[in-house]
């Protein structure tokens, strides 16, 4: 049985993330979406809120689970007996970053294999950070994040969207 981990801060989860999760879930027996802390960013949502938002969006994927995780990704992977790390690539800048992370992870744990999925064109040009910036200005971001997530995002930012 192949268990994989798809880690991220998911602040918030995007349609691009969800596309990667759906695609990765078809490649492995068990996929764990690991909601992790990004120490270089100040999160908008708590870990508990992010786990709940993501779980709500993944009800149709029986081999996918969502877990909060702290510390090194390789340590979390060892704790859940995962050997495959799934990452997404939007552009060439992502490739360089992900290559370096893959090499570091491999040096920390030889059993880890990293699989990179290329973002599909509709999702290749935005990130959670960019979506938050646009949402702060009051723009509707529901084409980038699920509707329920967009509502929570606007509520948190004080930029509620009215129909």
UniProtKB/Swiss-Prot annotation:
Disulfide bonds: none annotated. It holds the Pfam family CTP_transf_like. Substrate binds at residues 9, 41, 73, 87. Pathway: Cofactor biosynthesis; coenzyme A biosynthesis; CoA from (R)-pantothenate: step 4/5. It catalyses: (R)-4'-phosphopantetheine + ATP + H(+) = 3'-dephospho-CoA + diphosphate. Its EC number is 2.7.7.3. GO terms for biological process: coenzyme A biosynthetic process. The keyword Plastid does not apply. Keywords: ATP-binding, Coenzyme A biosynthesis, Cytoplasm, Magnesium, Nucleotide-binding, Nucleotidyltransferase, Transferase. Reversibly transfers an adenylyl group from ATP to 4'-phosphopantetheine, yielding dephospho-CoA (dPCoA) and pyrophosphate. Homohexamer. This is Phosphopantetheine adenylyltransferase. It comes from Lactiplantibacillus plantarum (strain ATCC BAA-793 / NCIMB 8826 / WCFS1). The lineage of its organism: Bacteria, Bacillati, Bacillota, Bacilli, Lactobacillales. The gene is coaD.
